[in-house]
Amino acid sequence: MESGKMASPKSMPKDAQMMAQILKDMGITEYEPRVINQMLEFAFRYVTTILDDAKIYSSHAKKATVDADDVRLAIQCRADQSFTSPPPRDFLLDIARQRNQTPLPLIKPYSGPRLPPDRYCLTAPNYRLKSLQKKASASAGRITVPRLSVGSVTSRPSTPTLGTPTPPAMSVSTKVGTPVSLTGQRFTVQMPTSQSPAVKASIPATSAVQNVLINPSLIGSKNILITTNMVSSQNTANEASNALKRKHDDDDDDDDDDDDYDNL
């Protein structure tokens, strides 16, 4: 550290000379030159704060000017806040003795981390699980059936051949709407029938349509009675084949008669 004699007393300001004299009276003879500036800044800040507090106390007491009592009160309040000394040793020993008289919580006897009880730790969960059980609705016994709307059914007649017949092409468009009850409703579903197996004659086949009548019954809320009225085209195909066979038989009989006539 450098000595305070480096700066000439005549070249220093009056406030700096006063601060150097205070340090000399306190027995501080060796210090850096910037210590003077720091002490001056601290003194200026402390004096202005004390005067501001004294002015506030004077205005609160409804005084015209700031007197010495206001300054003493401001210094006392500021000293209690800024310049606090540590408590005496006897006071600290008394507090420590009272604190040590409280026994520590018991350690858990079982294995695991040797921690105090849960109420003294921060390891317990701080949340609760909420169950998501849904209440049964009052309309659980009601059964609803979706509305079924069937569009037009189209089928193209195909010419039968001697081989395996080709099934007719068809397209059915269905739409499912909102769930409704079938009680008191009646509707008809048209279903195309499968074509009869191999037909030996080349007869134009007509596509027959089966009519399925669905009529909800009032027997029970969960029972639906379905009555069907189906017209099959197999009978027509069988009749056509039988007529063709009879025609062939008649032709054979005519040929036999001609042969007998020639023999005669």
From Swiss-Prot:
Chain intervals with Low complexity compositional bias: 154-164
Family affiliation: Belongs to the TAF9 family.
A GO cellular component annotation in the UniProt record: transcription factor TFTC complex
Transmembrane annotation, as ranges: none
UniProt entry keywords in alphabetical sequence: Acetylation, Nucleus, Phosphoprotein, Transcription, Transcription regulation
Biased composition regions of type Acidic residues, renumbered to the chain: 250-264
Quaternary structure and partners: Component of the TFIID basal transcription factor complex, composed of TATA-box-binding protein TBP, and a number of TBP-associated factors (TAFs), including TAF1, TAF2, TAF3, TAF4, TAF5, TAF6, TAF7, TAF8, TAF9, TAF10, TAF11, TAF12 and TAF13. Component of the TATA-binding protein-free TAF complex (TFTC), the PCAF histone acetylase complex and the STAGA transcription coactivator-HAT complex. The PCAF complex consists at least of TADA2L/ADA2, SUPT3H/SPT3, TADA3L/ADA3, TAF5L/PAF65-beta, TAF6L/PAF65-alpha, TAF10/TAFII30, TAF12/TAFII20, TAF9/TAFII31 and TRRAP.
GO aspect biological process, one term: box C/D snoRNP assembly
Superkingdom of this protein's organism: Eukaryota
Modified residues (Phosphothreonine): T159, T161, T164, T178
Protein's organism: Bos taurus
Annotated disulfide bonds: none
Gene: TAF9
Phosphoserine: modified positions: S149, S152, S155, S158, S181, S196
UniProt protein name: Transcription initiation factor TFIID subunit 9
Post-translational modification N6-acetyllysine, affected residues: K5
